[in-house]
A protein has these predicted regions:
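Charged, terminal alpha-helix-loop-beta segments
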Residues: 1-129
Length: 129
């Protein structure tokens, strides 16, 4: 089955939305099954920044453009809203009233998403720990 993903009216061609949905399904399932604590969720999406790579000019241009487009597409998505939809769907369809509406809102409010390169990641990690 060929599925296309869109955000803000734009087709996501490089950002792997299917993978992201799988990650968020796993986090939401863990919360609803009480396998994870209900606390701050800082989702860090690590994307390798290839700008310093030494490549042939045409290859470098292609690799850099894919990286830039992936970052752009990633920034189109409201991940807190996507997580809210996934958590709500699983609660209603699979897990029932394991969480109150207040608990759900607290979890959703505590969700953050950060796109990080290999250079930004260590600094960001230090800032949240």
């Amino acid at each position: 089955m060929d599925i296309e993903y869109f955000s803000c009216g734009e087709k996501l061609e490089h950002f792997d939305m299917k993978q992201m949905i799988c990650h968020l399904l796993g986090i939401a399932t863990g919360i609803l099954k009480k396998e994870f604590e209900q606390k701050q969720i800082d989702f860090i999406y690590l994307l390798y920044d290839p700008t310093e790579l030494e490549l042939a000019a045409d290859t470098k241009e292609l690799v850099d453009s894919i990286y830039e487009r992936t970052c752009y597409e990633c920034n189109l998505v409201d991940f807190a809203t996507l997580f809210h939809v996934i958590l709500t769907f699983l609660k209603e369809e699979r897990y029932g009233d394991v969480l109150s509406n207040e608990e759900m809102e607290k979890i959703i409010y505590s969700f953050t998403f950060t796109l990080a390169s290999q250079e930004f990641y260590p600094m960001f990690l230090q800032s949240i720990t």
